[in-house]
Amino acid sequence: MRRPPSAFWTLLLYLAAFSTLSYAAAAGIVLQGDAGPGKGKHIVLVSGDEEYRSEQALPQLAKILATRQGFKCTVLFAINRKDGTIDPDQRDNIPGLEALDSADLMIIFTRFRDLPDEQMKHVVDYVESGRPIGAMRTATHAFDLKTSQTYQQYSWNSKVWDGGFGRQVLGETWIDHHGHHGKQSTRGIIAKGQENHPILRGIQNGEIWGPADVYEVRLPLPGDSQPLILGQVLDGMRPTDPPAAGKQNDPMMPVAWVKSYTGKQGHTARIFTTTMGAAQDLQNEGLRRLIVNACFWALGMEDKIPARTNVDLVGEYQPLPFKFGGFSKGIKPSDLLMR
């Protein structure tokens, strides 16, 4: 008679199975995904901001994309050069960006990064390849390249390439806070005429909400930009708070839009940008659905967007409030696989 497996061997078998789905890469984490419409596609998510906890938001987003939709996801982080921990204050180091060489979609959520040429080259090559981009919150001011001049035009305040990567590729650079930061939150209102856009499938008007405030943008947005969601400034930090009176909501600022970008080599890419996306914002199901739907759209897979995309949270998700210096210290990418 066979003896039942011990708890040790049961655990070992479980870990072996789990390791085929997710593992720690040299500088990030890789989630292989499972069956689903995204199977066979590779999304690289690049984090690195000091305030809005992209290091928490993007791993959760990757888990949703991999577990619920079948995408392979690689998540990269700002890494402390001395101890290998995730450190958003390390502005000059996001190792592993060579993963972009095989990516089908880049999702970027960085702020004022000053990356060395050998890392930045992978970003620039990706942007010029015509492959799609999804951008969140501070990605409008993703780079502040001071150490090297090679790719300085990508800086948020570039005069050579007006507004840099943010303005030229995504549609806007950093302008200002439009809502009162930390005191006024954001409700998402569907832009007139966009009700049937595939990215908005399954999203109700006013359903999207987040505690991070509305960013100011210049109107109209450039080129072929199409606003999808307008940010209604709320007088308070709860989704039930009333709209702010006065000029803040007249007009409302776009907080999510789509556009195209054609690079120097003539390749044209689909671009989705949202100035929402703080880690706490992703607790809102409507915003998660917006971003996941946008991934399908960016990849030219809008026919795969169902009536109500499954964007249920995966595992534990307790995001920290947005603030400078508020990240969890001592965490390595491999630690995130156990959460």
Set out the residue ranges of the language-model regions.
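A glycine-rich, often tryptophan-bearing local segment used as a flexible ligand/cofactor-contacting loop or short
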Residues: 108, 113-202
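Extracellular ligand-binding/catalytic regions of CAZymes and related secreted enzymes
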Residues: 26-38, 56-57, 67-68, 235-339
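Active-site-proximal beta-strand elements of phosphoester/diester hydrolases
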Residues: 47, 228-230, 272-276
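Bacterial N-terminal signal peptides
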Residues: 9-23
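N-terminal secretory signal peptides that target proteins for export/translocation
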Residues: 1-8
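Catalytic beta-strand/loop cores that center a nucleophilic Ser/Cys/Thr
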Residues: 28, 66, 72, 91, ...
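Nucleotide donor/acceptor-binding cores
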Residues: 41
